Amino acid sequence: MPLRPTVRLVLAVSLDGRLAFPGGGPAQLGGAGDRQVLEQALAWADGCLMGAGTLRAHHCTCLIRESGLLEERAKAQRSPQPTACVVSRSATPTFPEEWPFFQQPLERWLLHGEEAAAPSAAPAGFSQCLAMGTTWQETLAQLAAQGMQRLVLLGGASLAASCLRDDAVDDLQLTLTPRVVGGEHSWVPFDAAGLPPALASSDAWILQGAERLQDDELVVRYQRRLPP
């Protein structure tokens, strides 16, 4: 088993790199083509990482709906949906149990900050509650010990930045949507500090492919070049 899972950051962004419209709210820039490649990524994954703020914005997570993908997971004796891993500073976050998230047919784990006191039991609606390590490399090693080998990172921007800061993102899957929306909601926050200089190198990422989708969307896939 690998020392840590492979992490794939999957986002739909505008041509100017925004995740959402200037007014904020749920990130809903992608269309039908983006939905298709998103489900393909979910079908690849054992789990998906999402920030508590993203859950509060959407009240749910993405599910695999395409029958062929569900059949492939069933044949491989995998659960129909990847485990939803919600990342929160608090070990006892307040998420209303009436949100659709808690009725969705998947397993839910809570990953909380190491400084938070661990609860005696997982909060309502979650089957596991795990304390994160001091770095993402440590946290991912813990998830590998739980059987996670492939993770999709769904955002939001702060969570993506924290993983990039620890150089813990292996693959990028970005759907470019034909919009220029402006505003402050970039997929990497403008005030994100401490990103490794190596990520800015011209050879940091290897292009794996690009595919035109419906409605003039384009998905591009990059892989992190491993250091020598």
Predicted regions and their residues:
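Enzymes that bind and transform nitrogen-containing heteroaromatic metabolites
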Residues: 1-228
